Amino acid sequence: MSNYQQESSYQYSDRSNNGQQQEQQEKKEVEHSSYTHTDVKVNMPNLIAPFISSSAGLAQELVGEGFQASVSRITGASGELTVIDTEAETEEARRDLEAKAREQELLSRQFEKELERKTEAYRKQQEVETEKIRKELEKQHLRDVEFRKELMEQTIENQKRQIDLEARYAKKELERERNKVKRVLERSKFHTDIQVNMEAAAGSTHSGSSSVAVSESEKFQTNN
């Protein structure tokens, strides 16, 4: 049963006695429109408004146009039933429609406020997260600078060590070359020829000398 109290009048026509009678159903149509504008930065969900069939519509569907109902227990003949809305029912339906529109508008405003609240909360959260990321990037930049500084210092230190290493082994190589030259000089032979010629009025003098020197270093071997 519906929550609304409805009054319906039914008219039965006796085709054999009174002839066919037809009554026009009086209806009052109420058109209601509402407009709501929402300007938000997020996509508004497009929700389909729920449709609920009222009891009046259900009654119209059951005993509406072209429906023949048997009422032989009442009149002994078949008759056509027509649902007629009373003025009270029409007024009640109009009030319900207006109340429904007001509630829909209220729900829309509540939804908009909730959406704005969540959007603002999300924006603030994003600002906090962005600030954290910015600070972390600054720390990362400082770490990068320190790393590059340490890398440069290590590179310079390594180059110094490489230079010291090259110098040390170059010194050893020079020492070996010096020893080689010394050994060659100790084992070398010297040959000197000296010729002296003197010319004078009384005569001439010739003097010459030749010398050969052999130098070889002595080697000592010790057996333990």
UniProtKB/Swiss-Prot annotation:
Keyword Cell inner membrane annotated: no
Compositionally biased region (Low complexity): 1-13, 200-215
Gene Ontology BP term (one): response to desiccation
Keywords associated with the record: Coiled coil, Cytoplasm, Repeat, Stress response
Start and end residues of each stretch annotated as Disordered: 1-38, 200-224
Main location: cytoplasm
Cellular component GO terms, alphabetical: cytoplasm
Coiled-coil annotated spans: 80-191
Location of the region described as CAHS motif 1 in the Swiss-Prot/TrEMBL record: 122-140
Role according to the record: CAHS proteins are cytosolic heat soluble proteins that seem to contribute to the anhydrobiosis in tardigrades, but their specific mechanisms are yet to be identified. It is possible that protection during anhydrobiosis might occur via the stabilization of vitrifying small molecules such as sugars, but not via the direct glass transition of CAHS proteins themselves.
Family the entry assigns: Belongs to the Cytosolic-abundant heat soluble protein (CAHS) family.
Entry's free-text remark on domains: CAHS proteins contain 2 repeats of 19-mer peptides designated as CAHS-motifs that comprise each two octapeptides connected by a tripeptide.
Further comment found in the protein's record: Trehalose, a disaccharide essential for several organisms to survive drying, is detected at low levels or not at all in some tardigrade species, indicating that tardigrades possess potentially novel mechanisms for surviving desiccation involving tardigrade-specific intrinsically disordered proteins (TDPs).
Protein name listed in UniProt: Cytosolic-abundant heat soluble protein 77611
Provenance organism: Hypsibius exemplaris (Freshwater tardigrade)
Gene that this sequence comes from: CAHS 77611
